[in-house]
From Swiss-Prot:
Gene Ontology cellular-component terms listed: extracellular region
Species for this entry: Hydra oligactis (Brown hydra)
Superkingdom assignment: Eukaryota
Residues making up the propeptide: 19-57
Protein name (database record): Arminin 375
Subcellular location: Secreted; Target cell membrane
Taxonomic classification: Eukaryota, Metazoa, Cnidaria, Hydrozoa, Hydroidolina
Keywords: Amidation, Antibiotic, Antimicrobial, Immunity, Innate immunity, Membrane, Secreted, Signal, Target cell membrane, Target membrane
Keyword Signal: yes
Length: 89
């Protein structure tokens, strides 16, 4: 009998502190809107970077950006083979 009262008491506490359906729906809506705005900001930043690259009058800056974008972790293992091949010529 004590277990039943304990379960009912915990259920009562849970229902007391539970949010209403409308509050939960509003919170989910706000979270989705926040994620959409974050995605739009990221896309806007990417577009701004692309505009900078295409309008850049200094070619060395474009070259430097291209070098920075290289995924060095994938390239590094091949560097010794490239050096050996270049040294044989």
């Amino acid at each position: 009998m004590k277990a039943v009262f304990a379960i009912l008491f915990l259920a009562f506490i849970a229902l007391t502190y539970a949010k209403s359906y409308d509050e939960v729906k509003e919170e989910i809506k706000n979270e989705v809107e926040r994620e959409i705005f974050e995605d739009l900001e990221e896309e806007s930043d990417e577009l701004d970077n692309y505009v900078e690259e295409s309008n850049d009058a200094k070619p060395w800056r474009r070259w430097r950006r291209a070098v920075r974008r290289i995924r060095w972790r994938k390239v590094v293992p091949y560097i010794p083979a490239i050096v050996r091949a270049a040294g044989k010529k």
